[in-house]
Amino acid sequence: MRSICTTFLLRKKVLSLGKAKEKSVFLLLFARLFVPLQIVMIVCIAEKPSVARDIARIIGATTSHDGYMEGNGFQVTWTFGHLCTLKEPHDYTPMWKSWSLTSLPMIPERFGIKLIDDNGIKKQFSIIERLMQQAERIVNCGDAGQEGELIQRWVMQKAQAKCPVSRLWISSMTDEAIREGFQNLKDQQDYQPLYMAGLSRAIGDWLLGMNATRLYTLKYGQNRQVLSIGRVQTPTLALIVNRQKEIDNFKPEPYWVLATVYRDTTFTATKGKFTSKEEGEQAFQTIEGKPFTVTKVEKKEGKEQPPQLYDLTSLQVDCNRKFGFSAEMTLNLIQALYEKKYTTYPRVDTQYLSDDIYPKCPQTMNSLYQTKFGGVAPYAALIKPIGGKPLKKSKRVFDTSKVTDHHAIIPTGVIPQNLSDAERKVFDLVARRFIGVFLPDCKFSTTTVLGEVRSAATESQPTENAIEFKATGKEILDPGWRVVREEKKEKEEEDDQQDTSLTSNSSPLTSEKDEERTLPTFVKGESGEHRPTLTEKMTTPPPYYNEASLLRAMETAGKFVEDETLRAAMKENGIGRPSSRASIIETLFKRHYIRREKKRLVATPTGIELIDLIREELLKSCELTGIWEKKLRDIEHQKYDAQQFIQELKAQVTDIVRDVMSDPTNRRITVAPPEPVKGKKEKKEKK
């Protein structure tokens, strides 16, 4: 009997012919002559129908059936995201059906999965099950990530599939990527560590979520209202609550700034602020009426590198700052662009490309050059200066060692058409960021001018006194990559000033708005009159979180860093995954733990009460949750044992239950109903 391997290789040959239908049909008939008694079926399973249709079209499965497509020796079927889930407590024992403190902690001896209770899901699964049990080989075409691996593995386990499984692993949904993927199918066993990390995450979330939610609801809740506790959502809520308390407890304090205007240029005292009015006034009197002398003029030229390519979090941050898009909305938009083949796989946490992507970049750039929206080619003028030249190759862009499963988000080279306004905005950010990394550095000149005002010695002050002042200006000599930046809108600038804790791509050039100015020509030793001022100001509290700054805080476990290299290192201990952070924020809204006030994220009284109530650092500490995330990544990279992780978690959950049960207080929390959004009613009436 001819081996399945031979037939499989023959089909791979058919795939490589693309649209050469005559050759494809000839080879298919040739194959059938040698396998007359048995039709060997390869079942491909995708994560959603739209992806399945694209795959089916490429591999020649063009005949539609109920729940799958068939042709060319392939059957292509699909899930609808998750078809299976971990069993619920009552599936293990009837004792866990009712909520009772005496039944805690709930720790199954062995975790199991079950079909989600939905008629549509049950029908589709029965089709998948039948196809898989008859298949000679399965190709797992699930989303190329941890969650996608988990979705398909659970379905195959539930269907009791026994045949060999191959893995389609691609970073974009273009026809070329699908063909290349099928010509280079992987062994599913290569992705076992990825599956174990996903499984460990799911079990960990079950153990902590199920037990802690029941524990806190029964111990501290009332009126049968659920107090939801989660491994990621609770530390995220704690970030918001703690920031809010900082703001509420903040007491403004006055300080005074000494400055002077010389030749229409404002110079500020290098001493910094004065915390005492008397000290400030004394300094003011010292310089009043005395000449200002320039002591030093220094000019330096510098370069600013282009910002790195987007990962999911940095894209969500920029979309929130520029357009007000929520993290969830941005994820949905970039996912849609990926499924339409316009951008690469979005759920990534790297800002690098592997070296093998470099040869494909000129074609992508050429496609962007031809791209038009409303008859206008927005990228042609940006690309023209580097047209016909080899694209520069920088280690800040191409570094295979910084890429694991997927590379940074970039355009695929397919010219986008029929995009919604929101999709176009997101695509535009990705396209401009991609173009920017191949443009020259921005060149600028920095001018620093130091001056002083000296006072003569007096009876009360026997020594001569001098107060130093400084002014800094910067001038763009060659914008380089900065041409890809669109002018900031006034509203966005206001948002940036309100949240200085957030910087997605900071640089010395953009750190201070008042330094973006060109100074007059000053000469060392020149002197003249000046107008000193002493201005009283008040210290300000830290800003409220918005979605952009919260995403950054989740990424770095609550530690704010502006340096890109340091931020990349901090990602190892961030809380949540890039793909899950948006849903975590939405969960906090749905639980009425937080609400929006314009762009601000504000904790509700219930959210504040809940965090105040939780004493166990394990439940609300960003650092500890970040360590968990690090262990899950280590499981994926075979540096940590999954079984050990789960055993540790079981012990921690047992400790939490014991500690909360021993609380002698009778504290209670009431989940408040959602507060009405101001202005919502009026808007409705206007319609």
PLM segments and residue spans:
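Intrinsically disordered, low-complexity regulatory segments
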Residues: 37-206, 210, 496, 501, ...
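Basic, low-complexity terminal or inter-domain segments flanking catalytic cores
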Residues: 42-43, 158, 213, 249, ...
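Metal- or metallocofactor-binding catalytic centers and their adjacent structured scaffolds
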Residues: 276-310, 316
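C-terminal or mid-to-C-terminal helical accessory/interaction module adjacent to the motor/catalytic core
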Residues: 126, 133-134, 177-256, 260-262, ...
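Short hydrophobic targeting helices and cationic amphipathic motifs
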Residues: 9, 15-17, 27
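Conserved short loop/turn motifs at secondary-structure junctions
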Residues: 41, 142-144, 223-226, 299-308, ...
